[in-house]
From Swiss-Prot:
It is linked to Anemia, sideroblastic, 2, pyridoxine-refractory: A form of sideroblastic anemia not responsive to pyridoxine. Sideroblastic anemia is characterized by anemia of varying severity, hypochromic peripheral erythrocytes, systemic iron overload secondary to chronic ineffective erythropoiesis, and the presence of bone marrow ringed sideroblasts. Sideroblasts are characterized by iron-loaded mitochondria clustered around the nucleus. GO terms for biological process: erythrocyte differentiation; glycine import into mitochondrion; heme biosynthetic process. This is Mitochondrial glycine transporter. Preferentially expressed in erythroid cells. Solcar repeats lie at residues 25-114, 121-205, 215-299. It is a multi-pass membrane protein. One of its GO terms (cellular component) is mitochondrion.
Length: 304
């Protein structure tokens, strides 16, 4: 009798073992820790991102010659759109930040394991690690970043994330989904590189072996605040350019044109509009994300 030579079908137990093995992989753990930390920080600081976007896109005719501050925009949003209006754009923010932060930390962990092999990074290595990891995450999440920016601006009435993706693709093509990508990378990659450098260097100054274990998260958070402020100041102009290119891709088609038009309409000050809410949000988000990430990685027995 001829025996059936076909391989046996994969059993449910085998599938379960494979999934369990994947979940135990350090890179997957780093991705999960990063995703959870990104969720926490996004929920808390979304209003600051919305205020930043509104401040950056105010037209001179909207307020005459008067300078509009963050508090005035905050009160206007609450008055016209309710308190929950401050969380407009939350869905694309979550869709962007949760996997985006996970991709960032997962890539960062992989690069550190491959290139550093256990030794602490130098200042230059920290910059390169941050730039590389953020670039990967930025390219992957660019379409969601475009949608998030348009939601927050209040100038687009998309019904859902899927509807927004379909509308942008039909009206602007695939380029519309990646509008402002160069400006985004010029903003995010240097921010992550500069942030990681200052964060690691500041942590190296602090004698962690002499700090009470319960105070280590607070110490790490403080280091993150310091690093975030410096990185935010350096990358603010790129953020303004990115916002305009994503909201008005037909008007701002390339970076040089965007720089010229923003300077013409707003002057040098235009490149720093929305700087305060952005610095607050980016600094607090990065500090919280890194603190939560490092604590979770330590609980899993992994070195972050």
């Amino acid at each position: 009798m001829i025996q059936n030579s076909r391989p046996s079908l994969l059993q449910p137990q085998d599938v379960g073992d494979t999934v369990e093995t994947l979940m135990l992989h350090p890179v997957i753990k780093a991705f999960l820790c990063g995703s959870i930390s990104g969720t926490c920080s996004t929920l808390l600081f979304q209003p600051l991102d919305l205020l930043k976007t509104r401040l950056q896109t105010l037209q001179p005719s909207d307020h005459g010659s008067r300078r509009v501050g963050m508090l005035a925009v905050l009160l206007k949003v609450v008055r016209t759109e309710s308190l929950l209006g401050l969380w407009k754009g939350m869905s694309p923010s979550i869709v962007r930040c949760v996997p985006g932060v996970g991709i960032y930390f997962g890539t960062l962990y992989s690069l550190k394991q491959y290139f550093l092999r256990g030794h602490p990074p130098t200042a230059l290595e920290s910059v390169m690690l941050g730039v590389g990891s953020r670039s990967v995450a930025g390219v992957c999440m660019s379409p969601i970043t475009v949608i998030k920016t348009r939601y927050e601006s209040g100038k687009y009435g998309y019904e859902s994330i899927y509807a927004a993706l379909r509308s942008i693709y039909h009206s602007e093509g695939h380029r519309g989904l990646f509008s402002g990508l160069t400006a985004t990378l010029l903003r995010d990659a240097p921010f992550s590189g500069i942030y990681l450098m200052f964060y690691n260097q500041t942590k190296n100054i602090v004698p962690h072996d002499q700090v009470d274990a319960t105070l280590i998260p607070i110490t790490n958070f403080s280091c993150g605040i310091f690093a975030g402020i410096l990185a935010s100041l350096v990358t603010q102009p790129a953020d303004v350019i990115k916002t305009h290119m994503q909201l008005y891709p037909l008007k701002f088609q390339w970076i040089g044109q965007a720089v010229t038009l923003i300077f013409k309409d707003y002057g040098l000050r235009g490149f720093f509009q929305g700087g305060i809410p952005r610095a607050l949000r980016r600094t607090l988000m990065a500090a919280m994300a890194w603190t939560v990430y490092e604590e979770m990685m330590a609980k899993m027995g992994l070195k972050s």
